[in-house]
């Protein structure tokens, strides 16, 4: 008798957090696709122990769980390039969720190659930006992989439905129908969405904040700190050399204590709608403030102004999920050139939600007191300004003469 050939089960790698959405996706994938589910949890500095997820993932039906410590790679390869670029989305958002997704997707693709998986799955909803960020990264890194996005397929239409689905299958979830906030946390930030925040008229409750306090509840005494940068990268705090993750964690603690980095905004999502989010980014706000101050001291006018223009495009690329792209790499090359002399020390004052400059110095400073002084000086001939003004204003003068001659004025 011929032995019947056993066809191996196809595999899918799931971006797994242990939260509501990804918890119910495991049984759903098995029930609807018949795939073996391999879960991957990324440690990006969520501030929680991920080891307990092993038991939960297996009980939910996964064959195995990868727990990947990506914190240092996250800071050095994703956060620091964005910081050096000065990228801020719509003037407020420091992109904490945006640049985390391409890194997670990158590791999913690597595990899929190792396991021989044919598909990647994620728990992003069909209304959000994360679905785009995950899938663009996968397409850029391995276009042969199938992508499964359950929220765009299944009959579950709300978080309440998802909770019911989980309860039916005995899967514990950390969300209740009474407080259905969606939170995303990593070493850079903590975001809050959903629930009563969906009405932009509602002020965030004080107990919402987890990384810090409301500014009015911050200490009544200011705190000063000094940050040292080398070529645009922060390397030490108050004279002490710290690793990338430790530095950011320390700044989060100090900044959070003083209510630094709380942003409440209505933003334009890539998928066409507006959404309201409350973000806590204490350490990131401190780093952006310090880095910008040092750039203003060390970059010439033309470079600084042009860099501010490309910062807008860089922020759009990161927000839109186009991290793995030739344009982003090209912009990085430009930014790296601008950062060669962004080295020095910045002193900041933290007080009740405010992070203000209290001093800046650099061996590459372009500020010259001799030229800038309003007192007596011997290096600047003020008479030279007349010729400059005449030439710079010539187009305006010619136009005014033409309008006068033609009777337009």
Swiss-Prot record:
Show the GO MF annotations: argininosuccinate synthase activity; ATP binding
Q: Which residues bind L-citrulline?
A: 93, 98, 129, 133, 182, 191, 267, 279
Which GO biological process entries does UniProt record here? argininosuccinate metabolic process; L-arginine biosynthetic process; urea cycle
Report the subcellular localization: Cytoplasm
Q: Which InterPro entries match?
A: Arginosuc_syn_C (IPR048268), Arginosuc_syn_N (IPR048267), Arginosuc_synth (IPR001518), Arginosuc_synth_CS (IPR018223), Arginosuc_synth_type_1_subfam (IPR023434), AS_cat/multimer_dom_body (IPR024074), Rossmann-like_a/b/a_fold (IPR014729)
Q: Which reaction does it catalyse?
A: L-citrulline + L-aspartate + ATP = 2-(N(omega)-L-arginino)succinate + AMP + diphosphate + H(+)
Describe which pathway this protein belongs to, using the record's wording. Answer: Amino-acid biosynthesis; L-arginine biosynthesis; L-arginine from L-ornithine and carbamoyl phosphate: step 2/3
Quick one: which residues bind ATP? 15-23, 42, 123
Q: Which family does it belong to?
A: Belongs to the argininosuccinate synthase family. Type 1 subfamily.
Q: Give the multimer and partner information.
A: Homotetramer.
Q: Which PANTHER family match?
A: ARGININOSUCCINATE SYNTHASE
Could you tell me what this protein is called? Argininosuccinate synthase
Look up and give the organism this protein is from: Desulfitobacterium hafniense (strain Y51)
The taxonomic lineage of its organism, from the top, reads: Bacteria, Bacillati, Bacillota, Clostridia, Eubacteriales
Q: Which gene produces this protein?
A: argG
